[in-house]
């Protein structure tokens, strides 16, 4: 059976409700924290490291919730939301691979911000390159990612780490 390699907004909303990978498994956050409108490509191969990749998009409109509060008179998408979106996508990759448990961001290496998302932008694109997937007692992925706005790269993150846990009691 071939795995689905692209996901619509409705698919991602199903994932946020726990309906895509099954109860107790990886979920995306619900809106407003869901920072992705679609995954245009997901693969177990390819990417910079040949271990998998994801490409996803977020449509930008001036009425997005964060522009009203960050900052008044100087609206800009918080950089941490772009970083969170990359963690969301690494966790989605683990669920898509069939690894059981709830996703948790575990950290990252170097993060760089060298641009911004303004209300005049049209589209944010996320590119995730899987470096390694650990399967066993700990199921975890390590990836590098980037965020682009209207075709221009504005953030990068190295060593994004996300794990999935069948119990988060001691997390």
Swiss-Prot record:
<comment type="subunit">
    <text>Homodimer.</text>
</comment>
<keyword id="KW-0444">Lipid biosynthesis</keyword>
<keyword id="KW-0276">Fatty acid metabolism</keyword>
<keyword id="KW-0456">Lyase</keyword>
<dbReference type="GO" id="GO:0006636">
    <property type="term" value="P:unsaturated fatty acid biosynthetic process"/>
</dbReference>
<keyword id="KW-0275">Fatty acid biosynthesis</keyword>
<dbReference type="GO" id="GO:0005737">
    <property type="term" value="C:cytoplasm"/>
</dbReference>
<dbReference type="Pfam" id="PF07977">
    <property type="entry name" value="FabA"/>
</dbReference>
<dbReference type="GO" id="GO:0019171">
    <property type="term" value="F:(3R)-hydroxyacyl-[acyl-carrier-protein] dehydratase activity"/>
</dbReference>
<keyword id="KW-0963">Cytoplasm</keyword>
<dbReference type="GO" id="GO:0034017">
    <property type="term" value="F:trans-2-decenoyl-acyl-carrier-protein isomerase activity"/>
</dbReference>
<keyword id="KW-0443">Lipid metabolism</keyword>
<comment type="function">
    <text>Necessary for the introduction of cis unsaturation into fatty acids. Catalyzes the dehydration of (3R)-3-hydroxydecanoyl-ACP to E-(2)-decenoyl-ACP and then its isomerization to Z-(3)-decenoyl-ACP. Can catalyze the dehydratase reaction for beta-hydroxyacyl-ACPs with saturated chain lengths up to 16:0, being most active on intermediate chain length.</text>
</comment>
<dbReference type="InterPro" id="IPR013114">
    <property type="entry name" value="FabA_FabZ"/>
</dbReference>
<comment type="pathway">
    <text>Lipid metabolism; fatty acid biosynthesis.</text>
</comment>
<comment type="similarity">
    <text>Belongs to the thioester dehydratase family. FabA subfamily.</text>
</comment>
<dbReference type="InterPro" id="IPR029069">
    <property type="entry name" value="HotDog_dom_sf"/>
</dbReference>
<keyword id="KW-0413">Isomerase</keyword>
<protein>
    <recommendedName>
        <fullName>3-hydroxydecanoyl-[acyl-carrier-protein] dehydratase</fullName>
        <ecNumber>4.2.1.59</ecNumber>
        <ecNumber>5.3.3.14</ecNumber>
    </recommendedName>
</protein>
<dbReference type="InterPro" id="IPR010083">
    <property type="entry name" value="FabA"/>
</dbReference>
<feature type="active site">
    <location>
        <position position="70"/>
    </location>
</feature>
């Amino acid at each position: 059976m071939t795995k689905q390699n692209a996901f619509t907004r409705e698919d991602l909303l199903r994932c946020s409700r726990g309906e895509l990978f099954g109860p107790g498994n990886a979920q995306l956050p619900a809106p407003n924290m869901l920072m992705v409108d679609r995954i245009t490509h997901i693969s177990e191969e390819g990417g910079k490291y040949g271990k998998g990749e994801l490409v996803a998009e977020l449509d930008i409109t001036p009425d997005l919730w964060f522009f009203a509060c960050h900052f008044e008179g100087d609206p800009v998408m918080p950089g941490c939301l772009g970083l969170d979106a990359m963690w969301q996508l690494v966790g989605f990759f683990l669920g898509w691979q069939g690894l059981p448990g709830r996703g948790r961001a575990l950290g990252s290496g170097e993060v760089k911000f060298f641009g911004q998302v303004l209300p005049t932008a049209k589209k944010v694109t996320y590119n995730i390159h899987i470096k390694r997937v650990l399967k066993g007692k700990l199921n975890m992925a390590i990836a590098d990612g980037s965020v682009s706005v209207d075709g221009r790269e504005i953030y990068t993150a190295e060593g994004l780490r996300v794990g999935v846990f069948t119990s988060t009691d001691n997390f």
